[in-house]
Amino acid sequence: MAKKVTGYLKLQVPAGAANPSPPIGPALGQRGLNIMEFCKNFNAQTQKEEKNTPIPVVITIYADRSFTFEMKTPPMSFFLKQAAKIQSGSKLPGRDVAGKVSSAQVREIAERKMKDLNCDSIESAMRMVEGSARSMGLQVEG
C-alpha cells in the first residue's frame, strides 16, 4: 500500500548549497522533516551542477514524516541571463533592451528545459523561451 501524502513543498535551492538555515530549515522543520537528511541528499545529487545554480525542488511529504524530492531544471530566466551575460532583465521590457540572445542559444535552452515544459515539439519550446526572453527585455536574434 502506498504511503499517505500529506503535502507538497516547493523550494528553489542553490545547487550544492543546501543548509539548515532559512529558507530551507524553517520550511522543513515546521513540517517535522529531517532537515539534515534533505540537505545531504540534495547536495549529493547536485554536486555535478554549477555551484549556486538555482534548482527548483518539489518535496512530497508523507504522513509518517518521511519525504521524497524531485528536482526540476533551473528556471528559464537563469539560462536566459547566462546566455545574454546580464545580471537582471530590463526594468521596462518592450521599451528597453537589456541584452540579446541568438536563436541557437534559444534552441539550446529549449532543449535543456524540454522535460519540464508542457509542450510536444522543440519549436513550441523555443517559442516559450522566446516569449520569456521578450518579457525580460531581451532581443531574440535570428
Curated annotation (Swiss-Prot):
Output the Gene Ontology cellular-component terms.
cytosolic large ribosomal subunit
Q: Which GO terms describe its molecular function?
A: large ribosomal subunit rRNA binding; structural constituent of ribosome
| PTM (free text) | One or more lysine residues are methylated.
Q: Name one Pfam family in it.
A: Ribosomal_L11_N
Which InterPro entries does the annotation name? Ribosomal_uL11 (IPR000911), Ribosomal_uL11_bac-typ (IPR006519), Ribosomal_uL11_C (IPR020783), Ribosomal_uL11_C_sf (IPR036769), Ribosomal_uL11_CS (IPR020785), Ribosomal_uL11_N (IPR020784), Ribosomal_uL11_N_sf (IPR036796)
Alphabetical GO biological process terms: translation
Keywords assigned:
Methylation, Ribonucleoprotein, Ribosomal protein, RNA-binding, rRNA-binding
Query: What function is annotated for this protein?
Result: Forms part of the ribosomal stalk which helps the ribosome interact with GTP-bound translation factors.
Subunit comment: Part of the ribosomal stalk of the 50S ribosomal subunit. Interacts with L10 and the large rRNA to form the base of the stalk. L10 forms an elongated spine to which L12 dimers bind in a sequential fashion forming a multimeric L10(L12)X complex.
Report the sequence similarity comment from the record. Belongs to the universal ribosomal protein uL11 family.
Which NCBIfam families does this one have?
A: L11_bact
Task: Write the protein's name.
Answer: Large ribosomal subunit protein uL11
Q: Whose protein is this, by species?
A: Rhodopseudomonas palustris (strain BisA53)
Q: Species lineage, top-down?
A: Bacteria, Pseudomonadati, Pseudomonadota, Alphaproteobacteria, Hyphomicrobiales
